[in-house]
Amino acid sequence: TNTNINTNMKVIKRSGSIEEVSFDKIIKRLRSLCEVEPKLDIDATDIAQQVISEICDGIKTTELDEEAAKKCAYMVTIDPAYGELASRIIISNNQKSTSNSFSETVTQLYNNTDIHGKSVPLVSEGLYKIVMDHKHKLNDVIDYSRDFGFDYFAYKTLERAYLIKINGKIAETIQH
C-alpha cells in the first residue's frame, strides 16, 4: 500500500510534477541504495521517519535526498555504514538531477545565457569544439559508478566550490 503522510502534503518531483508525499517511496529509495553492493545493514525506516518529521508542503524530492543524506552523515559515529549511505544518497541525487551525457553537459555550459538572454558561456569555445568532435568517445569513457567512490563530505566540498552551476543549480556530475 502507498502510505501518504498527509493528504495535503505535496512533493515536487525533479520533472516538476507534483504528487502526494509517500513515506513508502522514501523508504523504497533508501532501501534500494542500501542494497547496492556492498550492501548496508541500516534501518531505512528510521532514517525515513527522521526525514518525514522535518518536511513541509511543497518540498522538492532533491531536498528530501539532501535531508536524508544529512541525517545519515550525522549518524556516522553510530555506524560508518551511515556515511556510505549518505554518499550514495547525495551522489545519486546529483546524477538524477543532471545529464548523464558529458557532451550534453558541455553543450549546456557553452550555451549558458544571463537573465537578459545574452550568451555567457561557462566553458571556452575551444573546449566545446573538442568535446563535440569527440563526444561519442568521451561519453563512452565515463563510468558513473565511479562517482560513488567519493564520500559525502568530499562531494559536498565539490558541490560548494567546484561543480559548475547554471542559475544556482548544479549542472555537472563529479566526472563532468
Model-derived regions, located:
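Extended catalytic cores of very large enzyme megasubunits
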Residues: 2-176
